């Protein structure tokens, strides 16, 4: 199995206290290839910083999270944000009411020409759009 991790799933890999962290780790451990968009790095760093500012994440946890993020990023196959992905993301944002980075994640995941790729996300709107596009899902339940 191959997996595309959006940022909501990626954060759960290095923040085990987050709900869903066990499932995210199980998906990571069982995948042959793990993919994400290069923009996930910015989103994940922003999430860590926001957690620190709101005092939900201690400074030591933020630093540990940043180190873990670096490790996961080195182990993943990164999808670059190309002009074609940007155009496709714009179309997907309009069609599905997605936020900008979520549309980039969906467009990136759709570039993978692999039959057994699962979109791993805890973002409900992205999950619905991925489902509509025919992707298999893991993470958030659509029920």
Where are the regions that the model predicts?
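Short active-site oxyanion
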Residues: 1, 31-34, 75-77, 113-118
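Helix-adjacent hinge/juxtasegments
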Residues: 49-81
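Acidic catalytic patch
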Residues: 40, 67, 74-96, 103-107
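Short, well-structured N-terminal submotif of metal-dependent ribonuclease cores
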Residues: 1-40, 51-64
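Acidic, PIN/NYN-like endoribonuclease modules and their adjacent C-terminal/linker elements
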Residues: 2, 106-107, 111-143
């Amino acid at each position: 199995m191959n997996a595309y991790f959006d940022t909501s799933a990626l954060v759960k890999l290095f923040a085990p206290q987050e709900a869903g962290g066990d499932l995210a780790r199980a998906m990571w451990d069982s995948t042959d290839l793990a993919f994400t968009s290069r923009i996930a790095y910015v989103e994940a760093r922003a999430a860590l910083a926001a957690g620190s500012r709101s005092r939900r994440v201690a400074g030591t946890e933020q630093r540990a999270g940043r180190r873990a993020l670096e490790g996961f990023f080195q182990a993943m196959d990164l999808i670059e944000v190309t002009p074609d992905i940007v155009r496709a993301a714009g179309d997907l944002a309009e069609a599905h009411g997605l936020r900008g980075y979520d549309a980039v994640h969906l467009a990136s995941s759709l570039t993978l020409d692999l039959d057994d790729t699962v979109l791993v996300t805890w973002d409900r709107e992205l999950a619905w759009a991925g489902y509509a596009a025919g992707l298999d899902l893991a993470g958030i339940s659509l029920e």
